[in-house]
A protein has these predicted regions:
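Extracellular calcium-associated, cysteine-rich motifs in secreted modular proteins
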Residues: 1-34
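Extracellular glycoprotein-like low-complexity segments
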Residues: 31-181
Length: 181
């Protein structure tokens, strides 16, 4: 592809895939697909090293991601959480080998620390998204309201990113933060 026509000149993408039809190719686009709706997120700091946890839940519109279960089984996925200042709060990466089909059209990925992400197909046609990150090392407990909202990005193979922010209402204690929309 000539440089003048390349939708992502900094990264090789011979197919020029552009799922959302904007000017950026999927491998350069920070938000390729819609449909992710995260409604809750929580963080808990443990006094023990490498024992912090965080979790998130919400839905994913199957109409915007009809092949997501097959894509995840074939290529894995990554989840990232950033605060409103775009600093990383936590992330999980699952290789294809750690993901399997569950239920009727769903998928579950589990890593060596027993962290999981589950996309459960529901009768309404959407997916219930459940994330449980275990044995993590959070640099510090996020401060609320200063760090809220939190952006959750679910990335599937070929760099398809789905983003949503959560944190309209947050509460905190000395060791935990909980936010919801």
């Amino acid at each position: 592809t000539s440089c003048a026509l390349d939708n992502c000149p900094a990264v090789a993408n011979p197919g020029q895939a552009n799922l959302d039809g904007d000017a950026e190719g999927d491998v350069c686009d920070a938000s390729d697909a819609t449909g992710l709706s995260i409604t809750k997120i929580s963080f808990r700091k443990s006094p023990k090293a490498a024992s912090d946890v965080w979790g998130a839940s919400g839905t994913l519109d199957a109409a915007t991601s009809p092949t997501i279960a097959a894509d995840v089984i074939a290529g894995g996925l990554t989840l990232a959480v950033k605060n409103q200042g775009a600093a990383s709060v936590g992330s999980l990466t699952f290789a294809a080998a750690s993901c399997k089909s569950v239920g009727k059209g769903g998928v579950k990925c589990t890593d060596a620390q027993k962290s999981t992400v589950k996309l459960s197909k529901r009768a309404a046609g959407d997916f219930r998204v459940t994330v449980s990150a275990r044995k993590q090392s959070l640099a510090s407990l996020p401060a609320v309201p200063a760090d809220a909202p939190f952006t959750v990005t679910l990335t599937t193979p070929t760099s398809i990113d789905r983003n949503d922010a959560v944190g309209a209402v947050c509460s905190s204690t000395a060791s935990a933060v909980k936010c919801k929309d």
